């Protein structure tokens, strides 16, 4: 009886805090409603969405978007940490060491990436001959991602960036108790590799402007979002749970498809394959990056694809240029990309600032985007 009261109180507390969160937007003359970053409130909102969608959506997605130096990565990390802490606390209160895995989802009814064509023999040969990249297509934003079956049975999806930016889908999944309830998927794993940039018609400019829209495998990132959207709309099993977390634990599906996604190694300055693994444990996916609301080429599809799932939250972090300039200049200096803070400022002005202004001028227009302040 005491346990039931505790779960009811937590659920009630979350709903009340979500209401308080919603009425504290800063009403200003901007394209989107504004509010100050409050990680606890953001976690409430994310869990509230999951609770609202739980009968029809196995998982939900969150987009955190902002210019370089806006703190989007930190916000995403703090948010995932807060959500995972709350779920772990729930499991401890219920004396649960692992999720139940009691009822199966409808995942077996969904063929992920079924619309992606098989790789052709000539393309496969070109991939092998060029060390895993496709030099002829590295600048082709209209390149159609392709798939191939690996020896272990996994399905690999690759775009114009080739193997460095590929993601894989596995249906033969061993239960992994270490996976997180909320996971971050940074856009960084879709930076075109330096080998790809060297294959551009103007490789010097490509390396100089690394981080600009043409230097990402936007083709395959959009395809990843389509695949994630499919997993969002998979219907979970049914149960009589009274709280959101209880429902998630009881409907955990250990056989849910696993998606392995590339990350980015800053020491190697290149993407790293299979850095992130989203499996049946992952019920909240936090995508963060600069171009997730960019209303041009493949990026413009990201918001629409995920919005159509009915299980999406979008937060755009806005901040003045002079603030992000200082932050990024110091970051360039501290990471060894610039010999001084002043040189870091010049690097920022010649690349990062251009990208930030490009995004502001070309934001997806949606009444469901909330702007955050992170000064």
Swiss-Prot record:
Gene label: YFH7
Reported function: ATP-dependent kinase that could be involved in endoplasmic reticulum membrane assembly.
Native species: Zygosaccharomyces rouxii (strain ATCC 2623 / CBS 732 / NBRC 1130 / NCYC 568 / NRRL Y-229)
Domain of life: Eukaryota
Family note: Belongs to the YFH7 family.
Keywords of this entry: ATP-binding, Kinase, Nucleotide-binding, Transferase
EC id: 2.7.1.-
GO MF term list: ATP binding; kinase activity
InterPro entries: P-loop_NTPase
Keyword hit for ATP-binding: yes
Coiled-coil annotated spans: none
SUPFAM superfamilies linked to this entry: P-loop containing nucleoside triphosphate hydrolases
Spans through the membrane: none
Sites where the protein binds ATP: 66-74
Keyword check for ATP-binding: yes
Protein name: ATP-dependent kinase YFH7
